[in-house]
Regions:
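All-alpha prenyltransferase/terpene-synthase fold signal
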Residues: 1-215
Length: 215
């Protein structure tokens, strides 16, 4: 999990995480990539100690899927025709898959022969992970940088559509849609409060909360 966050900070060029400077801010992106790789390899070394190929298989597949999620999200940057299916897919691969694999590996280790137990815990954790990502996207439009522990609206400035923006865009009239698309990926300085107010006004937060509750 830590490795994915370190790499995610490099991809997003995030200066802070949990209220402190990121590795790439303190040093360079190269440091972030190498330290992330080091942590990944350490995780696999620890898993090898369990001598369980099923756990190793799950961990390696999850690592591959998480990278896939980052690539899918990068491919959606700047696109204004992103669907809810696209967003759920990214949430699953980037976050849900990590939750799912973590729970599944623990379940395999604890009750290897109980397939129903393993599957139920895996599915629960998958949906919990997707819900976590939806909540994280919602908080980006609800809290300030200090409360969030990282810069707010960073996805928006990078041209990444998240749930609140998606729903607001879907509900917008021609004038509001023009404004929303003008700030997507824009390097111009806009007041965060103005953007958040517009997203709220268009039902972006409310509909995201409704989606969150469905998970």
């Amino acid at each position: 999990h830590t490795a994915t966050l370190v790499h995610d900070d490099v991809v997003d060029e995030s200066p802070t995480r949990r209220g402190i400077d990121t590795i790439n801010k303190n040093w360079t992106n190269s440091h972030g990539i190498l330290i992330g790789d080091f942590i990944y390899s350490k995780a696999f070394m620890l898993m090898i100690g369990l001598s369980d190929m099923e756990i190793l298989d799950e961990l390696s597949k999850a690592t591959n899927d998480i990278s896939k999620g980052e690539l899918i999200q990068l491919g959606l940057i700047g696109k204004n025709d992103v669907s809810i299916h696209d967003l759920i897919k990214v949430s699953y691969f980037k976050t849900g898959r990590l939750f799912e694999a973590s729970a599944k590996c623990g379940a395999i280790f604890a009750k290897k022969d109980n397939k129903t137990y393993i599957n139920n815990l895996s599915n629960f954790s998958k949906y919990l992970g997707i819900a976590f990502q939806i909540k994280d996207d919602m908080l980006d439009y609800s809290l300030n940088s200090k409360q969030l522990g990282k810069p707010t609206l960073q996805d928006l400035s990078e041209g990444k559509i998240t749930y609140p923006f998606y729903f607001a865009l879907k509900n917008a009239n021609v004038k509001d849609k023009k404004f929303l698309l003008s700030i997507l990926g824009s390097k111009k300085h806009y007041k965060n409060s103005k953007i958040i107010e517009k997203i709220e006004l268009l039902g972006g937060i409310k509909q995201t909360e409704k989606l969150l509750k469905s998970y």
